[in-house]
């Protein structure tokens, strides 16, 4: 008694019929249990069985654009009987491979290994995504970076409040910011290699989960030891997005738009530390108290975890290909399908040599990475030093109350936005330079905005120092210095990051990790001596000392602009297109 064919059987029959019409010499008719006739290849029983699974997969899950399998050397399931097997006709096998039905798995006597690959122009690759998808992912990643940087200085104002709660000195209380930044310093050693092994998304998810948990722990901490320890681990997990986000943006954007995307990331890196002291000051002064600075930070982290998990896509091409190969294995049950990168057999020694130690190797053996990182680290550390200097200038000298004393940070914030605008306006010029050399990145063409910033940065510091030194000078004057200082900091830091990405394009995550390690170490130390330096030397001369150092670093972008290409040619790890 015959039964009505199912929709799956009809789809399979239709697909096979089309294939049989294309290659009738390879097929013969067999009867199915439901008395429906099917055209199957003229192969052995075992091959026909293997084909059945492949055919059903091809009918239900056709290969999408840009996906393909590359045939490797056959691996016999029973090598001892290899000589007794009938070898398939190579011409027939080639026809089967070309057949739309059999393009998923070539049908041969023995199982084979297949390398799953994706065409570089496939829409699966992040750089080929539609603009809306890129914009969505970029906004999510920017928010994650903002959460991380927000937490770094949100404890700057509460640090003074906890001196009376836990009966500690001001210097000890300032360690709450230092240990967080030391966590920043240690985290990239783990997150950068992990992002190159497993993709960009897993480190961010793990980082935001740990970030939220340890910020809650700080909020409920009963003693200073608990707070210090939890702040360190919060910084360790918070360093994940700072290490990975820039590399993820490099995955998504070509030379034309990468600089604009990195501008958004850099703005978030600086906006967080400038906004959080204002929030922290008013929260600490309110009935909520200093603990709510950490509650709010943890809520931000958990929200970031949710939106990254639900809406953020993986951007690393190697991880995307591995994920698709895993999906095909699960659907077809053929565990010979794999990505090329999965053929690598990594030992602990290989992981340490090729991944864990790469950031340190870049930092201490590559002059480009070391000098560029040194400059960006100095301006980044000055930002955290100013978080301690502003309360002296506006709180102690001008008697602003808590919260209000932090409002002049808005000047720095506006300066950061001005610097971002300058960089975005510069991007078309950079893109034309890239087109002039065949569309390849030109790291030295990134540096003209830094040449502007290297003058604005020391000018802003001198402006703040001597206008802030005299209490009779209206507070607006030193507050406006933040326009020059913030703009200079952003232009220098941003182009340093862009230069590292372009110069070490295939090691971008490791280069950013090296940068994060050094700049976090310097930022951790600067606030510890800021208060004593500004008290003992006076605001004018303490600031001038920093201004003189910034002035001495002015030649840095000019040296790399004129000699950077020659230096890169001598490098073992930098790219030279």
Curated annotation (Swiss-Prot):
<feature type="transmembrane region" description="Helical">
    <location>
        <begin position="543"/>
        <end position="563"/>
    </location>
</feature>
<feature type="transmembrane region" description="Helical">
    <location>
        <begin position="204"/>
        <end position="224"/>
    </location>
</feature>
<feature type="region of interest" description="Disordered">
    <location>
        <begin position="68"/>
        <end position="93"/>
    </location>
</feature>
<keyword id="KW-1133">Transmembrane helix</keyword>
<feature type="transmembrane region" description="Helical">
    <location>
        <begin position="174"/>
        <end position="194"/>
    </location>
</feature>
<feature type="transmembrane region" description="Helical">
    <location>
        <begin position="262"/>
        <end position="282"/>
    </location>
</feature>
<keyword id="KW-0256">Endoplasmic reticulum</keyword>
<keyword id="KW-0812">Transmembrane</keyword>
<feature type="transmembrane region" description="Helical">
    <location>
        <begin position="232"/>
        <end position="252"/>
    </location>
</feature>
<feature type="transmembrane region" description="Helical">
    <location>
        <begin position="447"/>
        <end position="467"/>
    </location>
</feature>
<dbReference type="InterPro" id="IPR020846">
    <property type="entry name" value="MFS_dom"/>
</dbReference>
<dbReference type="GO" id="GO:1903711">
    <property type="term" value="P:spermidine transmembrane transport"/>
</dbReference>
<feature type="transmembrane region" description="Helical">
    <location>
        <begin position="402"/>
        <end position="422"/>
    </location>
</feature>
<dbReference type="Pfam" id="PF07690">
    <property type="entry name" value="MFS_1"/>
</dbReference>
<feature type="transmembrane region" description="Helical">
    <location>
        <begin position="504"/>
        <end position="526"/>
    </location>
</feature>
<dbReference type="GO" id="GO:0005886">
    <property type="term" value="C:plasma membrane"/>
</dbReference>
<protein>
    <recommendedName>
        <fullName>Uncharacterized transporter C36.02c</fullName>
    </recommendedName>
</protein>
<comment type="similarity">
    <text>Belongs to the major facilitator superfamily. CAR1 family.</text>
</comment>
<dbReference type="GO" id="GO:0015606">
    <property type="term" value="F:spermidine transmembrane transporter activity"/>
</dbReference>
<dbReference type="GO" id="GO:1903710">
    <property type="term" value="P:spermine transmembrane transport"/>
</dbReference>
<dbReference type="InterPro" id="IPR036259">
    <property type="entry name" value="MFS_trans_sf"/>
</dbReference>
<feature type="compositionally biased region" description="Polar residues">
    <location>
        <begin position="1"/>
        <end position="21"/>
    </location>
</feature>
<feature type="compositionally biased region" description="Polar residues">
    <location>
        <begin position="68"/>
        <end position="87"/>
    </location>
</feature>
<dbReference type="InterPro" id="IPR011701">
    <property type="entry name" value="MFS"/>
</dbReference>
<keyword id="KW-0472">Membrane</keyword>
<feature type="transmembrane region" description="Helical">
    <location>
        <begin position="473"/>
        <end position="493"/>
    </location>
</feature>
<dbReference type="GO" id="GO:0055085">
    <property type="term" value="P:transmembrane transport"/>
</dbReference>
<feature type="transmembrane region" description="Helical">
    <location>
        <begin position="367"/>
        <end position="387"/>
    </location>
</feature>
<feature type="transmembrane region" description="Helical">
    <location>
        <begin position="292"/>
        <end position="312"/>
    </location>
</feature>
<feature type="transmembrane region" description="Helical">
    <location>
        <begin position="139"/>
        <end position="159"/>
    </location>
</feature>
<keyword id="KW-0813">Transport</keyword>
<feature type="region of interest" description="Disordered">
    <location>
        <begin position="1"/>
        <end position="24"/>
    </location>
</feature>
<dbReference type="GO" id="GO:0000297">
    <property type="term" value="F:spermine transmembrane transporter activity"/>
</dbReference>
<dbReference type="GO" id="GO:0022857">
    <property type="term" value="F:transmembrane transporter activity"/>
</dbReference>
<dbReference type="GO" id="GO:0005783">
    <property type="term" value="C:endoplasmic reticulum"/>
</dbReference>
């Amino acid at each position: 008694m015959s039964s009505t064919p199912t929709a799956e059987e009809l789809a399979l029959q239709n697909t096979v019929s089309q294939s049989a019409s294309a290659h009738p010499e390879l097929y013969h008719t067999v009867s199915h249990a439901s008395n429906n006739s099917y055209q199957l290849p003229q192969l052995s029983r075992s091959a026909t069985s293997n084909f059945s699974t492949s055919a059903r997969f091809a009918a239900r899950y056709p290969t999408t654009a840009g996906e393909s399998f590359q045939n490797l050397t056959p691996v016999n399931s029973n090598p001892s009987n290899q000589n007794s097997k009938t070898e398939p006709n190579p011409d027939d096998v080639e026809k089967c491979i070309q057949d739309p039905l059999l393009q998923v798995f070539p049908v041969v006597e023995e199982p084979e290994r297949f390398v799953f690959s994706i065409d570089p122009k496939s829409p699966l690759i992040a750089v080929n995504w539609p603009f809306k998808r890129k914009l969505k992912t970029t906004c999510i990643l920017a928010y994650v970076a903002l959460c991380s940087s927000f937490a770094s200085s949100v404890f700057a104002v509460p640090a003074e409040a906890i001196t009376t709660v836990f009966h500690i000195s001001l210097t000890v209380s300032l360690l709450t910011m230092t240990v967080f930044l030391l966590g920043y310093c240690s985290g990239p050693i783990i997150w950068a290699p992990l992002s190159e092994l497993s993709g960009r998304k897993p480190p961010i998810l793990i980082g935001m989960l740990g970030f939220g948990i340890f910020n809650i722990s700080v909020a409920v901490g009963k003693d200073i030891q608990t707070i210090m320890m939890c702040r360190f681990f919060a910084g360790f997990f918070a360093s994940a997005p700072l290490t990975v986000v820039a590399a993820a943006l490099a995955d998504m954007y070509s030379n034309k738009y990468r600089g604009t995307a990195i501008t958004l990331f850099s703005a978030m890196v600086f906006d967080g530390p400038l906004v959080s002291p204002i929030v922290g000051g008013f929260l600490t002064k309110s009935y909520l108290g200093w603990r709510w600075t950490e509650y709010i930070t943890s809520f931000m982290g958990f929200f970031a975890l949710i939106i990254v998990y639900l809406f953020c896509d993986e951007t690393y091409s190697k991880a995307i290909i591995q994920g698709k190969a895993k999906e095909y294995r699960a659907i077809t049950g053929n565990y010979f399908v794999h990505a090329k990168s999965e053929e690598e057999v990594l030992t602990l020694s290989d992981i340490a040599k090729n991944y864990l130690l790469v950031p340190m190797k870049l930092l201490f053996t590559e002059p480009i990475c070391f000098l560029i990182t040194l400059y960006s680290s100095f301006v980044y550390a000055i930002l955290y030093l100013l978080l301690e200097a502003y309360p002296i200038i506006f709180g102690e000298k001008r008697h602003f109350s808590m919260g209000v004393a932090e409002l002049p940070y808005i000047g720095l914030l506006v300066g950061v936005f001005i610097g971002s605008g300058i960089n975005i306006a510069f991007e078309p010029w950079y893109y034309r330079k890239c087109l002039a050399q065949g569309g390849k990145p030109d790291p030295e063409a990134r540096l003209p905005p830094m040449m502007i910033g290297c003058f604005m940065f020391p000018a802003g510091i001198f402006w703040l120092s001597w206008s802030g030194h005299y209490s009779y000078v209206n507070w607006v004057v030193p507050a406006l210095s933040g326009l020059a200082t913030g703009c200079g900091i952003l232009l220098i830091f941003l182009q340093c990051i862009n230069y590292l990405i372009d110069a070490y394009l295939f090691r971008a995550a490791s280069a950013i990790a090296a940068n994060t390690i050094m700049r976090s170490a310097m930022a951790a130390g600067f606030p510890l001596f800021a208060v004593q330096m500004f008290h003992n030397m006076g605001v004018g001369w303490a600031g001038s000392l920093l201004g003189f150092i910034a002035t001495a670093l002015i030649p840095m972008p000019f040296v790399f602009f004129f000699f950077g290409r020659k230096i890169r040619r001598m490098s073992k790890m930098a790219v030279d297109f």
